[in-house]
Amino acid sequence: MILRNFSFGLIVCLLAAHPVAAQVAPALPSRQELQPGQTLAPALAPRDPSGLFEQLPGGPCPFLGSDLSFTLRTVDLSGLPLEWEGIASEAWAARIGQSISVAELCTIRDDVARLLLARNLLARVEIPEQKIADGTVRLEVVPGRFEEVRVTGSAPATALVRKTLEPVTEAEHIDLNVIQRYLLLAADIPGVVLVPTIRAGSTRGGLVLEVAVDRKPVTLSLGGQNFNSRTQGRISGIARLSIDGLTGHGDRTTLLASTSADFRELQVYQIGQEYRIGAEGLTARGSFTYAIGRPGDVLAPLDLRSRSLVGNIELAYPLVRHRRRNLSLVGGLDLVDQRTRVFQTLPFSREHARIAYVRASGNVSSRYGDDPASLSASIELRQGLDILGAAEQGSFDLTRPFADPQATVVRANLGARYSPARNVSFIANGFAQYTSSALVTYEQMGIGNLSIGRGYDPNAAPGDRGAALALEVEFGPIVRTQGIVAPFVFFDAVRVTNLGPRGYSDTLRSVGGGLRGNIMNRLDFGLTYAHPLDPAFPGGPRADDRVLVTLSATFL
């Protein structure tokens, strides 16, 4: 306690002598700074099998060239499952009572198959041999079903792919909502590359799903960016190595290292592991992060040393898995230990937090008229727990003595994209956080270059609660032989509130524009000019303009 008070008093004296440093809190690394992998380009999405299912051909039209015609009175559709009856009448409703050629029966036949496919039922529609005497036409629906799934390949996860696809053969007819789920779950297995093909089976309406399994066992990503503050090292680099499918149980091992350019201000090391449990997509994940920091620039005279240990375990389950809509549920536990020392040895702060959380997240893509649109959202409930040595509210060694390590926090994210024209897209992303308590450093709402608030240093204005919104207009993408590029302009706005005895609110806004793109499907880049409109802290000068650069390349 005496050392803590001595350290705090010494820091106050030194900061008072340096007005710029006084505005830079000797805080621990934020949550965003301890997750540098987010600055790398996301992994390539699994192959979308949307083109796999096409309308089953009804066969050649036997009436082409015929001059025969008749008055259509009704259509008798047989072979359709009960739950699908009545949805195909649109194919012939406009022709009832009209004189049509017999060749138009093939058009009706194909339209019925198209309507069924739009309702996710894959079926073949046939015109059986018949005599049309009273204007009644008989059509027969032969619902497709998978007789067999053939999985080939030597990848360790081949057995897991086969087990994941087993439910495909259990359905009486092919419901694309069900089939897509299992194909996408199989494609989600780490390190697996699937090439599915549909072939005719040996029975009427029977199909065979052939899946060739290839393996991509190792992925290496290297990247760099200049998003950080001067105290944490403006420029940093990151390397991430993913090793997939070592055991055949849908496993992925991830090794990550990040460091400031001079290997001094902040270094982060992380190891992660995930496994599939069963064949329905349930995934167990765990990770451990070790970070050491030695802030420089105006904080260098304090010789601050920080150490962060973050452990995480979680379970994730895909409630809905579809190429156009997804919903997942995640539950987990964060174990956070962070400490700061001044002059290398004098204790200044120590924070031990144990946070349980549950999160629901989803996305949907569709069309608004003829224009593509997408929406994503998540909501998360986090609860600090008094277990495993967690700090208590009022502990003298917390960075914020009035913070509550057992606080309840609600977080929400929302994203939307709408493209009303071929080369123009409107993009909105936002997040909000609410709590009634002052929070420990790790739980605070971080804003800045690593989230929303481009042009401001990461964690420039941490908050206990608040909201942030990023609006963009993207032009393009402009496609060339060697790559693509998309110019954009943006407006960011953040409002944060800090609770506690010295609580305050702050608003940060910025505008700017830039380019993002990809070269040769390997190098992702981003270049952004950001012009802050507000001071980084109340009463201070307006933050300086920033040119932000990010690069990431994927190998192997």
Language-model-derived ranges and their functions:
Residues 218-228, 239, 250-261, 269-271, ...:
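Transmembrane beta-strand segments that form the barrel wall of outer-membrane beta-barrel proteins
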Residues 218-220, 247-253, 279-285, 322-327, ...:
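Repeated loop/turn-to-beta-strand initiation elements of outer-membrane beta-barrel proteins
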Residues 205, 233-237, 265-269, 307-311, ...:
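Residues that define the transmembrane beta-barrel architecture of outer-membrane proteins
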Residues 2, 23-228, 240, 258-267, ...:
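Periplasmic polypeptide-binding modules associated with outer-membrane biogenesis and secretion
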Residues 241, 515-517, 543-556:
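Outer-membrane beta-barrel "beta-signal"
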Residues 264-368:
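Transmembrane beta-barrel wall of Gram-negative outer-membrane proteins
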Residues 188, 215-222, 247-254, 289-297, ...:
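Flexible, solvent-exposed coil segments and beta strand-coil junctions
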Residues 339-485, 489-499, 535-541, 549-554:
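C-terminal outer-membrane beta-barrel translocator/porin domains of Gram-negative envelope proteins
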